[in-house]
């Protein structure tokens, strides 16, 4: 870190830059918790020191070819290349790290010992270990994916509006359910209402399905783990065989639900990465993350901020929360398996969300016609117990609900 600081100071003196001076750091004990929703700065011209090291802790293998870890690894390496960093020599990885406090701490210690300047931990269960490490290693930057903890100096969190992308994927599933004449849609999820992350994703997908096919029922089978390839396949098969589901979606790490869907002759919507290659006869589209959008911003801030303690101030917030408008989430290219009208509807709704005129969890629902056009209708947002979450015409629930306290399924969703 000392070498990095010296080099950065020299560069800034020569170029008369003052990147970290753009934002005043919060006073001790204070923190800016308002999420940054746009790119902090899209100018990637930044000195890339040869001794700058990026550390990453992955829950699955760095060699995965699809799914959650694959998407993060691709995002990190893409961002590094965009910034002039060399992943072959400047990326340090500890992979296949379970959500176990001691194992995560060991991975962090390894990366710090190898000289990492910034460490990304991509799994929710790493949260407490990263919080402790940020205090133990104040000269290192810690950035936690999908979490909510942070400090005012060297520790932030990042996530995004995945529910927006899932709504779009739900549109594809809804059109396909109508085409095949099957109102039963299945969903293999890591967890259900225990976590707002999974609940909001399931609800967003379901609302997209129901906007196209109001007679649909979405059956959810939960794994109790973020990754479990055996049961990811088994539960998809159960949803097909027991509940008669004709489309299978997922919130889990591998492509196994899509492969199971193909083997059973039905269709599916993946997650994290385009899974068409894994299940070319079944896959419709996937809700995906463009993780490089965030990783580029964070790495750039880490190289510009001079001291790790200035990182959060340089980022402008201790939390990053991007969506369709920032290009942080999206859907993968639609496959030839999609039904007529799907592309038109997804493009129209995507433009509506990006415009800021409408969002998913509001008291205004969309009714999507066969030609892909939509009508906006004031309607109560109701959970599957009949409770009104948002009254007809009301604004979207707050971000804090979507990321923290959404512990219900919307009407139309059933636990399998």
Task: Annotate each language-model stretch with its function.
Residues 1-9:
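Positively charged n-region of N-terminal signal peptides that target proteins for export
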């Amino acid at each position: 870190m000392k070498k990095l600081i010296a080099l950065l100071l020299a560069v800034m003196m020569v170029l008369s830059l003052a990147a970290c001076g753009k934002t005043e750091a919060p006073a001790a004990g204070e923190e800016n918790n308002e999420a940054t929703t746009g790119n902090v700065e899209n100018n990637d011209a930044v000195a890339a020191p040869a001794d700058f090291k990026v550390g990453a802790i992955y829950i699955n293998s760095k060699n995965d070819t699809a799914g959650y870890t694959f998407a993060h690894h691709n995002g990190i390496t893409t961002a590094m290349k965009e910034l002039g960093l060399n992943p072959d020599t400047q990326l340090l990885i500890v992979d296949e790290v379970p959500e176990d406090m001691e194992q995560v701490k060991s991975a962090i210690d390894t990366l710090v010992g190898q000289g990492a300047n910034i460490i990304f931990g991509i799994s929710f269960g790493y949260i407490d270990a990263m919080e402790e490490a940020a205090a133990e290693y104040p000269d290192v930057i810690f950035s936690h994916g999908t979490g909510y903890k942070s400090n005012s100096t060297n520790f932030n969190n990042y996530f995004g509006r995945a529910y927006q992308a899932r709504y779009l994927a739900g549109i594809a599933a809804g059109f396909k359910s109508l085409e095949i004449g099957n109102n039963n849609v299945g969903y293999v999820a890591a967890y259900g209402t225990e976590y707002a992350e999974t609940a909001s994703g399931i609800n967003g997908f379901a609302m997209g399905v129901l906007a196209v096919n109001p007679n649909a029922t979405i059956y959810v089978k939960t794994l109790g783990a973020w990754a479990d390839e055996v049961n990811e396949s088994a539960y998809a098969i159960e949803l097909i065989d027991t509940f008669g589901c004709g489309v299978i979606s997922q919130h889990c790490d591998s492509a196994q639900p899509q492969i199971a869907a193909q083997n059973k002759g039905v269709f599916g919507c993946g997650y994290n990465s385009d899974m068409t290659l894994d299940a070319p006869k079944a896959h419709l589209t996937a809700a995906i993350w463009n993780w490089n959008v965030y990783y580029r911003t964070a790495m750039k801030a880490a190289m510009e901020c001079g001291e790790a303690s200035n990182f959060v101030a340089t980022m402008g917030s201790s939390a990053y929360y991007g969506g369709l408008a920032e290009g942080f989430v999206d859907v993968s290219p639609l496959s030839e398996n999609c039904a007529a009208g799907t592309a038109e509807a997804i493009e129209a709704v995507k433009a509506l969300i990006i415009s800021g005129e409408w969002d998913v969890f509001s008291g205004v629902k969309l009714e999507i016609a066969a030609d892909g056009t939509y009508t906006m209708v004031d309607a109560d947002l109701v959970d599957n117990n009949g409770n009104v979450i948002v009254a007809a015409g009301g604004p979207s629930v707050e971000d804090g609900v979507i990321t923290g306290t959404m512990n219900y399924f919307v009407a139309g969703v059933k636990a399998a």
